[in-house]
Amino acid sequence: HASAHASVRLREDDRRAVHGKRNYTYSDVVRSVLGGRKFQLCGLAQYINLVGVTIGYTITASISMVAVKRSNCFHKHGHHVKCYTSNNPFMILFACIQIVLSQIPNFHKLWWLSIVAAVMSFAYSSIGLGLSVAKVAGGGEPVRTTLTGVQVGVDVTGSEKVWRTFQAIGDIAFAYAYSNVLIEIQDTLKSSPPENKVMKRASLIGILTTTLFYVLCGCLGYAAFGNDAPGNFLTGFGFYEPFWLIDFANICIAVHLVGAYQVFCQPIFGFVENWGKERWPNSQFVNGEHALNFPLCGTFPVNFFRVVWRTTYVIITALIAMMFPFFNDFLGLIGSLSFWPLTVYFPIEMYIKQSKMQRFSFTWTWLKILSWACLIVSIISAAGSIQGLAQDLKKYQPFKAQQ
């Protein structure tokens, strides 16, 4: 609810130009409405989140690719075999793909990318749900389920359950923290029909659809596996067969994240490149465009600064992912740190200022309560994720992650 409400407020603010200047990015909106220190804080929060998301996507994509290899190993040698596989080669492969894709100019004009991402997301979500339904309907070994989830003293200690609950809240927050790229996406839409109305409809449909899938995955997954449910049905091997269907679902995840990585890193690329142009306006290395001919592709514009900077960024995110390949804890931390400021606080503050809302009115009070409640959620989820990362690091050797 908070994510949907804040996105509506953000769309209402984004096209209210100040001093005749149209806003093209999330940070532009914050600067034009709130200005000063809040703009700086917004930029810091936004870019930390975007960097964290790209690292998280590198981890997730590699886990899915590893799952494909392990699935074939289990099918060939049996479920009793360990089939340990290193994540690192797949992170390197993912990084190589991203290095190539990051050099594509005007990446935001690849309209078909959104269609591919939507199809992939629907495919792997549907497969996960279908396999859960099949497991529940097929019976088999009984699973342990309780009204309050995992049992204290049986599955976990009391403190472990509290920390895991906090971490799970962060994972949920990560899933809904899309507001920081909402303006950039809206800017790619045509002006007719009005893009803010189109984006409002798309956002509401998207939130309702994803919420439906999240609830179904949670409920059906717990019904299928009970207290032993893995963190990820498709990569945690809650299912082994049909192996080809599980492979297909994991490939869909990887393909989805190939495009999603680019969507979230484009604002970072643009920010640094614009800064470079302002800092060194006469530099040919920074500003020069060179036409290169590629067979079957025609002429391709190349900028040396863009090549070096974007390649370096992808390599750095891949190295960090190799050092800290902790899926749930890492995503939970990103979600908890970015959810309140970017998804709740700034959209609400901008709406209050733009509408000249009277202090302590009913709406003002309700919005403030919503904002403070979400801040508390972010704090406790960050604590849970940090505790989880601390536990993971105690038994982890960098660059030696295996599944």
Please provide the spans of the model-predicted regions:
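N-terminal signal-anchor/initial transmembrane insertion module
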Residues: 1-14
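Membrane-interfacial loop- and helix-cap regions that link adjacent transmembrane helices
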Residues: 12-46, 56-90, 117, 124-339, ...
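Hydrophobic core of alpha-helical transmembrane segments in multi-pass integral membrane proteins
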Residues: 96-99, 315-320, 375-382
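C-terminal ends of transmembrane helices
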Residues: 100-107
